[in-house]
Amino acid sequence: MKLNKYIDHTLLKQDAKKKQIDSLLSEAREYDFASVCVNPTWVEHAKKGLEGTDVKVCTVVGFPLGATTSAVKAFETKEAIQNGADEIDMVINVGALKSGNLALVESDIRAVVEASGDKLVKVIIEACLLTDQEKVVVCQLAQKAGADFVKTSTGFSTGGATIADVTLMRETVGSDMGVKAAGGARSYADALAFVEAGATRIGTSAGVAILKGELADGDY
């Protein structure tokens, strides 16, 4: 198994400096990760830094709260793609889901899917804030709206991916969608366990340590 191609090598900290982003890009080139995941302000820089590789540039939309309007999320998506993004990780409207406004949750996801054209869209459900029933419902809505992946977490809330959540999400969407486990993978064994539970992508800042068989520090 080429575990490197499961990994979105991630740096989303608000105080990330250019030299840290450059280090992320260098590691991505060396280890040939699936993508780097960076904030929108770094997309253009990342695209240039990964020229000549097949490492994708992933960025986030409506991040980390998901509480911006659908129009803003659609604009963010279009701008990110213009700047070179290959993949979009959007955050759902958690408050709308909790309020039972499923039509808004679905239309919000659909707005990003439509704005993305042929680019990959991953839907962050922020599983740590949801009941199991809400997790099932929002995964179904993401599937209905035409998204490519469901993703567990932003890494900025109360918890990251769990094996139980990845298993439930995979059972819900079947084989038609990707499942991304974000946060929680600190070692090779962790990453492998998520893959065995049904994850097809792993979001982590610890990609290098994972591939080296080391235990990483940090919380994402």
From Swiss-Prot:
> Domain of life, per the record?
Bacteria
Reaction catalysis annotation: 2-deoxy-D-ribose 5-phosphate = D-glyceraldehyde 3-phosphate + acetaldehyde
Gene Ontology molecular function: deoxyribose-phosphate aldolase activity
Spell out the InterPro entries in the cross-references.
Aldolase_TIM, DeoC, DeoC/FbaB/LacD_aldolase, DeoC_typeI
Q: Which GO terms describe its biological process?
A: 2-deoxyribose 1-phosphate catabolic process; carbohydrate catabolic process; deoxyribonucleotide catabolic process
> What Gene3D superfamilies does the database record attribute to this sequence?
Aldolase class I
Q: Where is the active site?
A: 89, 151, 180
Q: E.C. number, please?
A: 4.1.2.4
GO cellular component terms listed in the entry, alphabetical order: cytoplasm
Name the UniProt key words of this record, in alphabetical order.
Answer: Cytoplasm, Lyase, Schiff base
Task: Write down the Pfam families for this protein, in alphabetical order.
Answer: DeoC
Per UniProt, subcellular location reads as: Cytoplasm
- What pathway does the annotation place this protein in? Carbohydrate degradation; 2-deoxy-D-ribose 1-phosphate degradation; D-glyceraldehyde 3-phosphate and acetaldehyde from 2-deoxy-alpha-D-ribose 1-phosphate: step 2/2
Q: Which SMART domains match?
A: DeoC (SM01133)
Known function? Catalyzes a reversible aldol reaction between acetaldehyde and D-glyceraldehyde 3-phosphate to generate 2-deoxy-D-ribose 5-phosphate.
* NCBIfam families, A to Z: deoC (TIGR00126)
Family, similarity comment: Belongs to the DeoC/FbaB aldolase family. DeoC type 1 subfamily.
UniProt name for this protein: Deoxyribose-phosphate aldolase
Q: Which gene encodes it?
A: deoC
